[in-house]
Amino acid sequence: MKRKDTLKDFRGKSIDQLQEAKIELLQQLFSLRMQKGTGQLKKNHLFKSAKRDIARINTIISEKNK
């Protein structure tokens, strides 16, 4: 159910808000990469969820641009 809630939230936002959310997720992904490199990361599943959310945002942005 969480994914559907996330999609509803993303679809309810404007393109500018989606761009901001995408930037935040990219920063989070960068932070996760740095933590993994230093051996501090314990939750590897966060990579997958961040990448998927970025892909969802990109899809919704392209849908709204049509």
From Swiss-Prot:
Keyword set includes Disulfide bond: no
The organism's place on the tree of life at top rank: Bacteria
GO cellular component: cytosolic large ribosomal subunit
Record keywords, A-Z: Ribonucleoprotein, Ribosomal protein
SUPFAM superfamilies: Ribosomal protein L29 (L29p)
Molecular function terms from GO: structural constituent of ribosome
GO biological process: translation
Family: Belongs to the universal ribosomal protein uL29 family.
Protein name: Large ribosomal subunit protein uL29
Organism: Francisella philomiragia subsp. philomiragia (strain ATCC 25017 / CCUG 19701 / FSC 153 / O#319-036)
Origin organism lineage: Bacteria, Pseudomonadati, Pseudomonadota, Gammaproteobacteria, Thiotrichales
